[in-house]
Amino acid sequence: MSMRIMVVEDDALIALDIVGLLEDLGHEVVAEAADAFTAWELAEGDTPDLALVDIRLARNTDGGKLAQQLYDRLGVRSLFVSGSITDDFREAMAAINPVGFIGKPVTRRSLGDALAACA
C-alpha cells in the first residue's frame, strides 16, 4: 500500500537518503521539514498519511511534541527515526500509538519492515 509521507529530519543528507528510500519503496513524499514549526504548517495544509519524525529537530524543536500534535489534532501517526531513542521516550510516546521506532542509520530493510507493519 502506497502512503503519502511527510519527512521531518534536520540533517539534509539523512533526509535526502530517507526520501530516496521511501520513493524506492513506492511511497510518495508529500512534504519535508527540518523543524517542528514548518512541519506543522505543511501538515495542516496537506495532511499526510504518516509522518516520519526525528526526535531532535532544527530550531531546538522537539519531534516528540510535534508527533503528539500531529496525532491529537490531525490523526496522523508517526514513525520515529533517531540515533537516540530511549525506553523513556518510547513510554512517553506510547499514548499516540506510533508506527514504530527506527535507529539511525536508516536502511531500506528497517524502513520497509516498519512501514509494512502499519499497512
Q: What are the language-model segments listed below?
A:
Residues 9:
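Conserved acidic carboxylate
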Residues 19, 32-50:
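Acidic, metal-coordinating helix/loop segments flanking the phosphotransfer/catalytic sites
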Residues 54-55:
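Active-site residues of response regulator receiver
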Residues 81-82:
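Hydrophobic/aromatic residues positioned on beta-strands within the core alpha/beta folds
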Residues 92-102:
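As written
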Residues 64-76:
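Short amphipathic alpha-helix used as the core "switch/output" element in two-component signaling
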Residues 88, 106-118:
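C-terminal output helix
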Residues 12-31:
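Two-component/phosphorelay signaling modules centered on CheY-like receiver
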